[in-house]
Amino acid sequence: MSMVVYNNQEGEEGNPFAGALTEFSQWLWSRPLGNPGAEDAEEEAIAAQEELEFPEDEAQARHSCLQRTTSWATPKEVSPSGRVYQTVRHSRMEYSRPTMSIRSQASYFSSSARPLPPPPVPSLMSWTPIAKYHPSSPTSTSSKLRRAAPKLIKRG
């Protein structure tokens, strides 16, 4: 079982789902994973944060990600691997500059009989608005649409 919840927002005001998603994310993150009484439970937690600054635009981009995985032994009838794995992750990205602010967050939960490969974490570089750094594509070069370069005509 796995579940992913996404929320993209330009400011939280006017977004009726922003508060609900924040509450859900907090509930999901605080929820005890695994079998609390299991003596052989193993837990792994990862916290990552990255930031980018664009001085020419007075812009900043931030990405933070928290992930927790818990596993514990279980009978072979329940899980062929003999363990159950549960993972919860919360990812939040922000991009802001004087004229705009964009926030995006996602929560992820999975429970499996075998360790799952980690879900892809959005890259901050691919998420930030970088279109202005790439030249626009050239206009069509077909012979019918090609325009001749302007010529200077001298009159005597």
From Swiss-Prot:
It is found in: Host cell junction, Host plasmodesma; Host chloroplast envelope; Host Golgi apparatus; Host mitochondrion outer membrane. Expressed as a nonphosphorylated 20kDa form and a phosphorylated 22kDa form. Phosphorylated by a host PKC-related kinase. Serine phosphorylation is required for plamodesma targeting. Residues 144-156 have a biased composition (Basic residues). GO terms for biological process: transport of virus in host, cell to cell. Residues 55-80, 106-156 are annotated as: Disordered. InterPro entries: Luteo_VPG. Keywords: Host cell junction, Host Golgi apparatus, Host membrane, Host mitochondrion, Host mitochondrion outer membrane, Membrane, Phosphoprotein, Transport, Viral movement protein. Poleroviruses are transmitted by aphids directly into phloem tissue. The virus replicates most efficiently in phloem companion cells and then moves through plasmodesmata between companion cells or into sieve elements for long distance transport. Together with movement protein P3a, facilitates long-distance movement of virions in host. Transports viral genome to neighboring plant cells directly through plasmosdesmata, without any budding. The movement protein allows efficient cell to cell propagation, by bypassing the host cell wall barrier. Binds ssRNA. The N-terminus is involved in homodimerization. The C-terminus binds ssRNA. The C-terminus is phosphorylated. This is Movement protein P17. It comes from Potato leafroll virus (strain Potato/Canada/Rowhani/1979) (PLrV).
